[in-house]
Swiss-Prot record:
Pfam family, one: YacG
Cofactor binding comment, as recorded: Binds 1 zinc ion.
Sections of the chain in a coiled coil: none
Subunit structure and binding partners: Interacts with GyrB.
Similarity field: Belongs to the DNA gyrase inhibitor YacG family.
Gene Ontology biological process terms, A to Z: regulation of DNA-templated transcription
Free-text function comment from the UniProt entry: Inhibits all the catalytic activities of DNA gyrase by preventing its interaction with DNA. Acts by binding directly to the C-terminal domain of GyrB, which probably disrupts DNA binding by the gyrase.
Name of the protein described by the UniProt record: DNA gyrase inhibitor YacG
Gene behind the chain: yacG
Cofactor: Zn(2+)
Organism: Shewanella sp. (strain W3-18-1)
Length: 69
Protein backbone atom coordinates (compact mmCIF):
# COMPACT_ATOMS: atom_id res chain seq x y z
CA UNK A 1 0.00 0.00 0.00
CA UNK A 2 1.57 3.32 -1.07
CA UNK A 3 2.08 6.16 1.34
CA UNK A 4 -0.43 9.02 1.21
CA UNK A 5 0.69 12.57 1.99
CA UNK A 6 -1.12 15.91 1.96
CA UNK A 7 -0.35 18.45 -0.74
CA UNK A 8 1.63 21.26 0.97
CA UNK A 9 -0.50 23.89 -0.77
CA UNK A 10 -4.14 22.71 -0.77
CA UNK A 11 -3.92 19.72 1.64
CA UNK A 12 -5.46 17.29 -0.89
CA UNK A 13 -4.35 13.68 -0.27
CA UNK A 14 -1.61 12.62 -2.71
CA UNK A 15 -0.45 9.06 -3.24
CA UNK A 16 3.37 8.89 -2.95
CA UNK A 17 4.00 6.56 -5.88
CA UNK A 18 5.99 6.59 -9.13
CA UNK A 19 2.87 7.47 -11.13
CA UNK A 20 2.27 10.60 -9.01
CA UNK A 21 3.71 13.11 -11.46
CA UNK A 22 3.71 16.17 -9.18
CA UNK A 23 4.47 14.63 -5.78
CA UNK A 24 4.39 15.94 -3.11
CA UNK A 25 1.93 18.28 -4.84
CA UNK A 26 -1.46 17.19 -6.17
CA UNK A 27 -1.19 19.13 -9.43
CA UNK A 28 1.01 21.33 -11.56
CA UNK A 29 -0.96 24.32 -10.27
CA UNK A 30 0.04 23.65 -6.66
CA UNK A 31 3.61 22.97 -7.74
CA UNK A 32 3.78 26.35 -9.50
CA UNK A 33 2.19 28.16 -6.55
CA UNK A 34 4.94 26.76 -4.32
CA UNK A 35 7.64 27.74 -6.83
CA UNK A 36 6.26 31.29 -6.97
CA UNK A 37 6.32 31.47 -3.15
CA UNK A 38 10.02 30.55 -3.14
CA UNK A 39 10.79 32.98 -5.98
CA UNK A 40 9.07 35.85 -4.16
CA UNK A 41 10.92 34.90 -0.96
CA UNK A 42 7.77 34.04 1.00
CA UNK A 43 9.71 30.91 1.93
CA UNK A 44 13.36 30.99 2.96
CA UNK A 45 15.85 28.68 4.57
CA UNK A 46 17.14 30.36 7.73
CA UNK A 47 20.89 30.85 7.78
CA UNK A 48 23.27 32.64 10.07
CA UNK A 49 25.27 35.35 8.35
CA UNK A 50 28.93 34.49 7.88
CA UNK A 51 29.92 38.11 8.30
CA UNK A 52 29.85 40.03 11.52
CA UNK A 53 29.47 43.64 10.44
CA UNK A 54 30.30 44.87 13.94
CA UNK A 55 33.66 43.10 13.75
CA UNK A 56 34.58 45.18 10.71
CA UNK A 57 34.43 48.31 12.85
CA UNK A 58 37.29 46.93 14.93
CA UNK A 59 39.63 47.53 12.01
CA UNK A 60 38.56 51.17 11.75
CA UNK A 61 38.85 51.07 8.00
CA UNK A 62 38.86 54.35 6.12
CA UNK A 63 36.90 53.48 3.00
CA UNK A 64 37.52 56.83 1.32
CA UNK A 65 41.29 56.41 1.54
CA UNK A 66 41.02 52.80 0.41
CA UNK A 67 39.12 53.62 -2.76
CA UNK A 68 41.40 56.54 -3.70
CA UNK A 69 44.38 54.22 -4.12
Amino acid sequence: MPLTVKCPICKTPVEWAPQSEFKPFCSERCKLIDLADWASEKHAIPVKSEFDLDALDEFDLDEDAFFKE
